[in-house]
């Protein structure tokens, strides 16, 4: 019966969705999810399953949990990835652990895989109450959906309609052991406080309380979807789907309410969690309304919202590369820092071909051969002469002519012959 219901949930996903990465802590809920996927694979052999266990290092039992998860996954023939993470406790243990967890998962998720979590009906109620406590709007009160994007990860939650008791009965019947995380009883954590001290009394008073909360969450989600639909035409005027940027042209003519809604819709399209009202107001004041010649940015979780001219960009936090000087020789390939790809120098037809293989594009520059030492740098603030007949130009003007945003200028490899600037690879060369 439970497997039939689970199969129906998976059937609601796109028909081409056959690959799943299962979040597996070893606890009751994720054990039920793992077993259900393993059983479903017997009926649907085309399913490609992997599991991932995140070692947070917060419990003395963490190593034992890894061993347990490895044994269970071996029994059901599902490959297991174990990833140990470091938690930034300045963000709080709960928030820091969640962010570290999803960062690790994102590194392992394959292009056609979907991350599957074991959230069930009682988890949904807790999520709704936590959103209520934060003063969330429709998007937050919509709680968790069967399929969504979080931290830029495609996620499915096929157990949302299942109660914890159903999962408990299923795992017991399967005779499969699970682990208990001792922190789950610590009511200092908000979710545990709700789970142990608040919600049991409500369920005792109203036995169908979880069903009612789930209906309310669904109503909120549907109202938010309707609002997004009504905003679609105006949003399309601002959103560049390819670059995931937000154009500010005519933005100031919108009402404050509509400005907030359009920005939230943009951030949601980019897979970010919703900012608070205070954060949204600060984003508008510090970035959108900043002087046109400034370099405004606003930190939002793992990302930065930046503005260049009349466009908002969403970028990761970048490392400071300004002091780097990387030697390179002809015939070599250099791995560039901070996920910028590789750069190679090849001698070709009496010239030097510089190839920058960036994860998104490939850039090429052709330079004269030299016997001088060659370096790759990421910062230069002097003058550039493009041809024998042209005047020296400030490099800042050249970046502006190529419409390169300020923060990207220090992420483009610059070629130097000794101390002479020769090329911004893929953009312009000096004589």
Curated annotation (Swiss-Prot):
One of its GO terms (biological process) is tRNA modification. It catalyses: cytidine(34) in tRNA(Ile2) + L-lysine + ATP = lysidine(34) in tRNA(Ile2) + AMP + diphosphate + H(+). InterPro entries: Lysidine-tRNA-synth_C, Rossmann-like_a/b/a_fold, TilS/TtcA_N, tRNA_Ile_lys_synt, tRNA_Ile_lys_synt_N, tRNA_Ile_lys_synt_subst-bd. The keyword Cell inner membrane does not apply. The keyword ATP-binding applies. Its EC number is 6.3.4.19. GO terms for molecular function: ATP binding; tRNA(Ile)-lysidine synthase activity. ATP binds at residues 25-30. Keywords: ATP-binding, Cytoplasm, Ligase, Nucleotide-binding, tRNA processing. It is found in: Cytoplasm. One of its GO terms (cellular component) is cytoplasm. It comes from the Bacteria. Signal peptide: none annotated. It holds the Pfam family ATP_bind_3. Ligates lysine onto the cytidine present at position 34 of the AUA codon-specific tRNA(Ile) that contains the anticodon CAU, in an ATP-dependent manner. Cytidine is converted to lysidine, thus changing the amino acid specificity of the tRNA from methionine to isoleucine. Belongs to the tRNA(Ile)-lysidine synthase family. HAMAP family: tRNA_Ile_lys_synt (MF_01161). The N-terminal region contains the highly conserved SGGXDS motif, predicted to be a P-loop motif involved in ATP binding. This is tRNA(Ile)-lysidine synthase.
């Amino acid at each position: 019966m439970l497997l039939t219901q689970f199969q129906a949930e998976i059937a609601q996903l796109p028909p081409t969705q056959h690959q799943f990465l299962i979040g597996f802590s070893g606890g009751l809920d994720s054990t039920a999810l793992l077993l259900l996927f393993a059983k479903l694979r017997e009926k649907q052999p085309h399913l490609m399953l992997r599991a991932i266990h995140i070692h947070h290092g917060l419990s003395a039992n963490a190593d034992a949990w890894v061993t347990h998860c490895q044994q269970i996954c071996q029994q059901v023939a599902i490959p297991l990835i174990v990833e140990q993470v470091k938690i930034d406790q300045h963000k709080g243990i709960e928030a820091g652990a969640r962010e570290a967890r999803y960062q690790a998962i994102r590194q392992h998720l394959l292009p056609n895989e979907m991350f599957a979590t074991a959230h069930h009906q009682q988890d949904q109620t807790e999520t709704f109450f936590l959103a209520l406590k934060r003063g969330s709007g429709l998007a937050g009160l919509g709680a968790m959906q069967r399929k969504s994007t979080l931290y830029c990860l495609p996620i499915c939650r096929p157990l949302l309609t299942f109660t914890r008791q159903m999962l408990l009965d299923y795992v017991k019947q399967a005779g499969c052991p699970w682990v208990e995380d001792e922190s789950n009883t610590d009511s200092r954590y908000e979710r545990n406080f709700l789970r142990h001290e608040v919600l049991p009394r409500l369920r005792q008073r109203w036995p169908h309380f979880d069903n009612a909360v789930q209906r309310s969450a669904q109503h909120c989600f549907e109202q938010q979807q309707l609002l997004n639909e009504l905003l679609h035409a105006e949003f399309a005027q601002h959103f560049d789907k390819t670059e995931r940027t937000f154009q500010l042209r005519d933005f100031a003519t919108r009402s404050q309410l509509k400005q907030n809604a359009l920005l939230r819709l943009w951030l949601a399209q980019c897979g970010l969690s919703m900012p608070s009202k205070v954060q949204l107001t600060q984003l508008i004041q510090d970035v959108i309304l900043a002087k046109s010649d400034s370099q405004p940015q606003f930190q939002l979780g793992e990302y930065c919202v930046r503005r260049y001219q009349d466009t908002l960009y969403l970028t990761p936090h970048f490392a400071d590369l300004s002091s780097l000087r990387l030697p390179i020789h002809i015939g070599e390939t250099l791995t560039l820092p901070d996920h910028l790809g590789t750069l190679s120098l090849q001698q070709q037809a009496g010239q030097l071909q510089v190839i920058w293989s960036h994860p998104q594009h490939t850039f090429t520059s052709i330079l004269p051969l030299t016997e001088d030492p060659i370096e790759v740098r990421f910062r230069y603030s002097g003058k550039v002469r493009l041809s024998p007949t042209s005047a020296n130009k400030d490099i800042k003007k050249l970046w502006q002519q190529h419409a390169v945003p300020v923060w990207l200028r220090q992420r483009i490899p610059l070629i130097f012959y000794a101390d002479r600037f020769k090329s911004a690879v893929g953009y312009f060369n000096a004589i």
